[in-house]
Amino acid sequence: MSTKPSNVVFNIDEEFGITEAIATIDNGDFGKRTIRFETGQLARQADGSVTTYLDDDTMLLATTTASNQPREGFDFFPLTVDVEERMYAAGRIPGSFFRREGRPSTEAILACRLIDRPLRPTFVKGLRNEVQVVITVLSVNPQDMYDVVAINGASAATQLSGLPVSGPVGGVRMALIADDAHPKGQWIAFPTHEQHEQALFELVVAGRIVSKKQGKKTVDDVAIMMVEAGATEQVVDRVKAGAPAPTESVVAEGLEAAKPFIEVLCRAQAGLAERAAKETQEFPLFPPYTDVVYDAVEKKVSKKLRSLLTIKSKQDRDEATNAYMEEIEADLIAQLGSDDEAAASKAIRAAYNAVMKKIVRHMILTEHFRIDGRGVTDIRDLGVEVDLIPRAHGSSLFERGETQILGVTTLDMLKMEQQIDSLTPATSKRYIHHYNFPPYSTGETGRVGSPKRREIGHGALAERALVPVIPSREEFPYAIRQVSEALGSNGSTSMGSVCASTLSLYNAGVPLKAPVAGIAMGLVSDEVDGETRYVALTDILGAEDAFGDMDFKVAGTRQFITALQLDTKLDGIPSEVLAQALSQANDARNTILDTMAEVIETPDEMSDYAPRITAITVPVNKIGEVIGPKGKTINSITEETGANISIEEDGTVYVSAASGAAAEAAIEKINAIANPQLPKVGERFLGTVVKTTAFGAFVSLLPGRDGLVHISKLGGGKRIEKVEDVVNVGDKLEVEILDIDNRGKISLAPVKNED
């Protein structure tokens, strides 16, 4: 394929033993970016070590190391990916008590998942040695995002390590930017944070180079392995103003635009490996079963297993297929005559699952059969309900077949925004989405407590789907926490969480810019009667996810996509097949939105238990007066009214209270200070004595405005020696304004009791 947008240069410093590959990414009018891979200087004892640079300032060290011996008893590949964020990379000291880095940030965990997903399939099947990939962020330009650079660095280090892997993986972030010079939008690679703020949509795409036959020729193409994508916060307003909407076709164009950049990154890594890689070592491989075992299982189970797979209920189907597997296992262990019964049992079970996968795939491709009897475009029965939890600010229950999600919304003051201490420029997050996946959701036991990486990833996907439709802080001055509880799982709880969140947010009274729904799709492909067939499945089950070649989750409004996640095992997907699958997902999304709209389609009244937050503006030069010395004034308003008050640097004041009356009382007191209506001579006030002196008592009339009752006025016409003989600090005193001088000083007199 063409490599016109980019080029690769290699350099070798034989004196110092350093080899480097430099890939140039050409974004046309938006300039060039340089990705540099360097090996030979740092971490030389690791099996593979590459220092990766984005331009000059962003620098990551990627290492890959394997254990000497395979892990016994493992029936999976033990790959671990860790991202170590060092705060010195941004010239900062960690904000923790001990002033050192602690548990990984959410951004680091999401970066680990971005690296793991495309890298794991490149390792040879059957490898059981532990492999650890560690990315250490050494330096980061505040304008750059390091996660996609880390994908390339991890792949390059693995290519040099001598481990049995296929070709390199290239990763690129693409941003769709529309401006006066590019009104239809242009996709650019490795956008800066400034460009991220301007973008309509972003894609993180990872892929590899594959060889394909075209007639008698063999040509190289880029096979996409992973996509993580989402619309930006301003997309709804920008589209209304005429910017291009990130529809299915626009997103597909972005995937194609990423391919040339992925190719050049893969070529740079491959060239580095040619010059500096260790010789590939021999590692013991542990295939899950032998051909003999597979043939024996297939011959014995095919007919009955095909019948069992038509049971619609997940639990009933699983019980029936598991019982049959145990029956087959008992028969074949004796028949095969293995010395190691445990190993034979494991092999028979693996072969049984492989045969089951083959049967399901063949039935899908030839008969459009699905395990639960649906057609390929059918959605499972939907259930929608809101306002389940009495004291929650908003709640919902979304059911799709056996997948059940409880959504709960909580609203609070903006000061409750999540504070972020990471290497990104973001310092806070107003919309927070948390996802919980307890073991009982699949009828199992297991660990509960702190979230696992999968839960953090699913929460981030659901959050990304909703962020574009969350109202601005000016329109809705609340911090919003959305929690998705997966109560039952059989296919895409993350997309169920998107639907439940829309319902719950509406129930809480949040004025979303548009409702959002999500759907999980699958794709099955294989050779049938000499031709390659593709079948896209709508609303996949857990089993269909495991048996398919590609799964992708699409969330969006009726007009455009807000989030997309894709993983595939195929060596490339024809563009027309992807277009058809995305169109199928769009139809399903609209069907779900129709069902949700029957229950709720506009914001409800806010819950009685939700705080009432009102925003007012005070002059910046009055902020100090509102706060008062050491916070005295603002604290007194809070104590008197029960309201919480938060003041921004621009003079915006947010007042939160349990009732509207308390909020109004606080606002009245703040306005009296910041936007005062000066009291007039003759007005009467019930004030509070705030200070006594030898010459009189100071009485607070309004917050920040006091007057003086001279000692001569306190005795009711009689002479008194001490002010404290009549009034003390804290006493309530009804007074009348006698005079206001040209400096604003107020003279008061007690109001005589007319009794």
UniProtKB/Swiss-Prot annotation:
It holds the Pfam family RNase_PH. It comes from the Bacteria. Residues 611-670 form the KH domain. GO terms for molecular function: 3'-5'-RNA exonuclease activity; magnesium ion binding; polyribonucleotide nucleotidyltransferase activity; RNA binding. Gene3D superfamilies: GHMP Kinase, N-terminal domain (3.30.230.70), K Homology domain, type 1 (3.30.1370.10), Nucleic acid-binding proteins (2.40.50.140). Residues 682-751 form the S1 motif domain. GO terms for cellular component: cytosol. Keywords: Cytoplasm, Magnesium, Metal-binding, Nucleotidyltransferase, RNA-binding, Transferase. InterPro entries: ExoRNase_PH_dom1, ExoRNase_PH_dom2_sf, GPSI/PNP, KH_dom, KH_dom_type_1, KH_dom_type_1_sf, NA-bd_OB-fold, PNPase. The keyword RNA-binding applies. It is found in: Cytoplasm. Its main location: cytoplasm. GO terms for biological process: mRNA catabolic process; RNA processing. Its cofactor is Mg(2+). It catalyses: RNA(n+1) + phosphate = RNA(n) + a ribonucleoside 5'-diphosphate. Coiled coil: none annotated. Its EC number is 2.7.7.8. Mg(2+) binds at residues 545, 551. HAMAP family: PNPase (MF_01595). Involved in mRNA degradation. Catalyzes the phosphorolysis of single-stranded polyribonucleotides processively in the 3'- to 5'-direction. PANTHER family: POLYRIBONUCLEOTIDE NUCLEOTIDYLTRANSFERASE, POLYRIBONUCLEOTIDE NUCLEOTIDYLTRANSFERASE 1, MITOCHONDRIAL. Belongs to the polyribonucleotide nucleotidyltransferase family. This is Polyribonucleotide nucleotidyltransferase. It comes from Corynebacterium diphtheriae (strain ATCC 700971 / NCTC 13129 / Biotype gravis).
